[in-house]
């Protein structure tokens, strides 16, 4: 299959994008693993939950690392506490703030020894939470929570960037090689605890950025899977692919939203009215109907409908009239005219789809405001680095929720990237009321009240507009008819554990 981009890391604690998540699920395993039944025990043999739902006891299966060493509760304790070390650069560390003292440890206010995760024996892990959580078991199935081999990590901090011989993992497949700029090759792990169900002998994940090249390779039989969740199919090819008899094209809604992000500390986007104007001036229907063509849904807010049914209606595309009025008001307040308006550059990851979409938005902004907008594309890792370093004005990026809970997407914007927790908020935007509402929702036992709190938080986000949601995503992919048993969820969990070829 094509992975489109190299994973940012093969260390599951450092995942930050979908290619990294896909690769981590191939190479590692966790206490639970996502299946069609939800979070299902994997390395955990038995799970006990306290009456107050704040303490979980995980009894572990007898399982082995790929180097033959036993996987123990101590590996889990070490891995989770290392993520919460203030000096460890885990972008998703905020997900572990649900652990007792997790947030305080990441801020350096308490030592990691005070975090609520303890190995009471090699096969017993006890976890204490800050508050009850309906999604905690689902979180243990997310690659961030997969353990790493403590001895390997302590002896060789570069183990995740080494060749296959030095790489130690726990999942259905072993790493054979990682050829930078080319591919990752894995083979069946004979020491995996459930190796008897793994039927594929080898998987090659290629790094092909050009969508047409990927499609041609699929059509020529060089790929068995093309497109989502790691890559995309050229939009102009979709109508013909959909009309084929016995089509191998599949489309399903996923818990993701593609947004244009604004750097709120850089002119002109320090102005809330400018951010609103630019967001309202985008005709999302044109983007979906003429460019994307994969049944995406115009985004009225951040949270996708497949995460929350009958979600609140927060229209952010209020039309050109309001966009122009806000633009004029902001220019008057800032003292800008046509000549002095700050130059604007829109950046995006290198793909034909993103380029065409950026060109369409560029034209819409020019027609609405009479300004010129420059476009700049980057290969994936460079693009992510530009966003993380806040070296941009407007940048397009999609996010897929880690969990089946609206809180997961909203929490991205709770703190800025320079906070110890990281979290992916590279807009410089921070709002105390927004953060307070999310914190209250986390601890709220009443589902109705919790929904109201999250809706109120999302309303603030959409009024302040550090992001302009464009569309709710779909997974659009090609799969050979003989490929069976692959699991792809609305969270873009792509799992080849049970995959096989039916010749």
Spans of features found by a protein language model:
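Append "and occasionally in soluble cytosolic enzymes with long acidic Gly/Pro-rich linkers
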Residues: 188, 270-363, 367, 374, ...
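Extracytoplasmic/peripheral linker and loop segments enriched in polar/acidic and small residues
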Residues: 118, 289, 371-383, 388, ...
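Alpha-helical secondary-structure segments
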Residues: 72-79, 122-128, 171-172, 200-202, ...
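Aromatic- and charge-enriched surface segment that lines or borders ligand/interaction sites
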Residues: 46-92, 126, 217, 268
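N-terminal lobe/hinge region of extracytoplasmic solute-binding protein
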Residues: 2-51, 168-169
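Gly/Pro-rich hinge or "lid" segments in bacterial periplasmic/extracellular proteins
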Residues: 37, 112-113, 118, 123, ...
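Extracellular/periplasmic solute-recognition and catalytic clefts
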Residues: 176-185, 204-266, 289
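Long beta-strand-rich cores associated with HINT superfamily self-processing modules
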Residues: 421, 477-503
């Amino acid at each position: 299959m094509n992975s489109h981009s190299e994973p940012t890391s093969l260390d599951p604690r450092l995942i930050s994008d979908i290619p990294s998540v896909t690769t981590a699920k191939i190479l590692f395993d966790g206490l639970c693993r996502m299946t069609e039944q939800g979070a299902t025990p994997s390395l955990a043999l038995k799970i006990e939950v306290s009456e107050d739902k704040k303490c979980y006891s995980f009894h572990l299966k007898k399982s082995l690392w790929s180097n033959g060493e036993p996987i123990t509760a101590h590996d889990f304790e070490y891995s989770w506490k290392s993520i919460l070390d203030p000096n460890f650069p885990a972008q998703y560390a905020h997900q572990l703030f649900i652990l007792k003292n997790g947030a305080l440890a990441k801020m350096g206010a308490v030592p990691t020894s005070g975090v609520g995760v303890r190995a009471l024996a090699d096969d017993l892990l006890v976890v204490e939470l800050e508050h009850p959580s309906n999604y905690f078991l689902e979180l243990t199935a997310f690659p961030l929570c997969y353990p790493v081999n403590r001895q390997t990590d302590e002896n060789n901090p570069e183990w995740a960037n080494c060749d296959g011989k030095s790489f130690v993992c726990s999942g259905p497949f072993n790493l054979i090689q990682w050829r930078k700029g080319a591919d990752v090759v894995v083979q069946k792990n004979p020491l995996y605890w459930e190796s008897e169900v793994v039927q594929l002998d080898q998987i090659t994940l290629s790094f092909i950025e050009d969508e047409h090249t990927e499609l041609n390779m699929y059509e020529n039989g060089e790929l068995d899977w093309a497109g989502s969740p790691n890559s995309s199919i050229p939009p102009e090819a979709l109508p013909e692919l959909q009309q084929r008899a016995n089509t191998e094209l599949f489309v399903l809604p996923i818990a993701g939203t593609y947004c244009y992000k604004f750097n709120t500390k850089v002119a002109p986007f320090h102005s809330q009215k400018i951010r609103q104007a630019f967001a309202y001036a985008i005709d999302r229907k044109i983007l979906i109907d003429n460019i994307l063509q994969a049944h995406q849904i115009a985004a009225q807010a951040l949270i996708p409908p497949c995460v929350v049914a009958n979600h609140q209606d927060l229209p952010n595309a209020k039309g050109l009239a309001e966009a122009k009025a806000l633009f004029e008001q902001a220019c008057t307040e800032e003292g800008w005219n046509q000549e002095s308006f700050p130059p604007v550059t829109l950046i995006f990851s290198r793909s034909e789809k993103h380029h065409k979409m950026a060109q369409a938005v560029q034209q819409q902004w020019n027609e609405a405001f009479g300004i010129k907008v420059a476009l700049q594309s980057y290969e994936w890792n460079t693009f992510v680095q530009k966003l993380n370093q806040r070296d941009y004005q407007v940048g397009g990026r999609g996010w897929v929720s880690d969990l089946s809970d609206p809180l997961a997407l909203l929490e991205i914007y709770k703190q800025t990237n320079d906070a110890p927790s990281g979290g992916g908020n590279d807009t410089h935007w921070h709002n105390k009321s927004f953060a307070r509402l999310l914190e209250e929702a986390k601890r709220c036992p009443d589902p109705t009240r919790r929904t109201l709190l999250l809706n109120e938080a999302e309303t603030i986000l959409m009024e302040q507009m550090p992001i302009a949601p464009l569309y709710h995503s779909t997974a659009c992919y090609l799969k050979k008819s003989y490929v069976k048993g692959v699991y792809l969820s609305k969270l873009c969990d792509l799992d080849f554990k049970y995959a096989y070829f039916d010749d």
